[in-house]
């Protein structure tokens, strides 16, 4: 529901016949510290996502599930949609996690990556144990928050030591591989994400910049290295933008073929569209149609997953602390319909907001919708943790004290799974 009309509807419900105040559909109805309405509008029910947040879900019945309060486990209720357009699911999405950033630091949207600005989330990167502890963060996210997937962004230039089309640099790949192996050791899925915006130093891959052969060389080497690791997920490219989508789809096809031919025959590969991978533009900008033609060498689309991003601020940039939308009506609902019609799946590999109440409300609503539609949405990965510190507007980096970690409010309220 449009937030601008929600206060008017709420006021009307109070004035009309002296009725008890009711929360509107998708509005917050409970949680630790909540002092607003706890009764939901007719046709919806209050659903507890976790101890910090509950919301009014339309057309709901209740089922029992387990959530994690600050001091230990408890039993609460979670609402599940019974609408035929959004098939109910009690288990939610398969994958939930966070980006562990740092190897991508220094990369800008024109595909320039200054390797001297890389800030790896490896505690012992220089042997002095004073770098961010990305592996420790992942261990916390798995053990305390029930997370199952991590995206590990890295710049193309870093991996090949600025040698376009060259071999993986032995020093660089060994450092990056420490993060990958740390992720794998936790039993999680690990997304290798090339964070170059479909570019190298300003030139678009396969469109006047690096050749497809130079790009597939990178992916052939990475796929060969991780071919035996079933939980390594290949994220072809971060946020392509301003590309010819049909030409880009042809590039993606070459990469998929190269990965499979390198021996990584069954792992997940995520296919990114145009317009910064926007979930809201995936259909309208032609990405869905173009990338639907990408196949494995045998002609199947098994484990080829559409890769989308969506932030919750006013301009979808992920640069503002406050959130203004839950992205359901404008992005995830129409995309879910298209995915079902075409028997495909997608994963949300970047989403985030500030650690403020507006984002807790909107993000929890967005995550709840993805969980209710897990037949087409495989999961979500928040942005971001790793080498981000507490001053970053979208930080999801937990703070450590001794052997314990404390999550940000957005993670504990919305992204955590237990």
From Swiss-Prot:
One of its GO terms (molecular function) is cellulase activity. Its EC number is 3.2.1.4. One of its GO terms (cellular component) is extracellular region. Residues 1-21 form the signal peptide. Keywords: Carbohydrate metabolism, Cellulose degradation, Disulfide bond, Glycoprotein, Glycosidase, Hydrolase, Polysaccharide degradation, Pyrrolidone carboxylic acid, Secreted, Signal. Glycans are attached at residue 124. The modification Pyrrolidone carboxylic acid is found at residue 22. It is found in: Secreted. This is Endoglucanase EG-II. It comes from Hypocrea jecorina (Trichoderma reesei). The gene is egl2.
């Amino acid at each position: 529901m449009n937030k601008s009309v929600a206060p008017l509807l709420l006021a009307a419900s109070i004035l009309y016949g002296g009725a008890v105040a009711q929360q509107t559909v998708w509005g917050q109805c409970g949680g630790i510290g909540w002092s607003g309405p706890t009764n939901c509008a007719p046709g919806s029910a209050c659903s507890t996502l976790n101890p910090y947040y509950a919301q009014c879900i339309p057309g709901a019945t209740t089922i029992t599930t387990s959530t994690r309060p600050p001091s230990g486990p408890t039993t609460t209720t979670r609402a599940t949609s019974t609408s035929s357009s959004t098939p109910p699911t009690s288990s939610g999405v398969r994958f939930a996690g966070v980006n562990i950033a740092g190897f991508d630091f220094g990369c800008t949207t024109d595909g320039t990556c200054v390797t001297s600005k890389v800030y790896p989330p490896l505690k012992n990167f220089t042997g002095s144990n004073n770098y961010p502890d990305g592996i420790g963060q992942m261990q916390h996210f798995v053990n305390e928050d029930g997370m199952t997937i991590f995206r590990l962004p890295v710049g193309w230039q870093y991996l090949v030591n600025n040698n376009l089309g060259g071999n993986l640099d032995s020093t660089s790949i060994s450092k990056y591989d420490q993060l990958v192996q740390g992720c794998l050791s936790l039993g999680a899925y690990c997304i290798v994400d090339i964070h170059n915006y479909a570019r190298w130093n300003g030139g678009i891959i396969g469109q006047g910049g690096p050749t497809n052969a130079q790009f597939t060389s990178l992916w052939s080497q990475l796929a060969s290295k991780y071919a035996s690791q079933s939980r390594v997920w290949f994220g072809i490219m971060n946020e392509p933008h301003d590309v010819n989508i049909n030409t880009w789809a042809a590039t993606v096809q070459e990469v998929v073929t190269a990965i499979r031919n390198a021996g990584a025959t069954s792992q997940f590969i995520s296919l990114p569209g145009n317009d910064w991978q926007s979930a809201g533009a995936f259909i309208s900008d032609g990405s869905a149609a173009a990338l639907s033609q990408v196949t494995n060498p045998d002609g199947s689309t098994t484990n080829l997953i559409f890769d989308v991003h969506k932030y919750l601020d006013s301009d979808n940039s992920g640069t503002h602390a406050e959130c203004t939308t839950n992205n359901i009506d404008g992005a995830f609902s129409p995309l879910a319909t298209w995915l079902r019609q075409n028997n495909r799946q997608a994963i949300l590999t970047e989403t985030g907001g500030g650690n403020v109440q507006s984002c807790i409300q909107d993000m929890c609503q967005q995550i709840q919708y993805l969980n209710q539609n897990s037949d087409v949405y495989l999961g979500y990965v928040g942005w971001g943790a790793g080498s981000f510190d507490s001053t970053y507007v979208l930080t999801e980096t937990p703070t450590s004290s001794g052997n314990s970690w404390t999550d940000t409010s957005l993670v504990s309220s919305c992204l955590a799974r237990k």
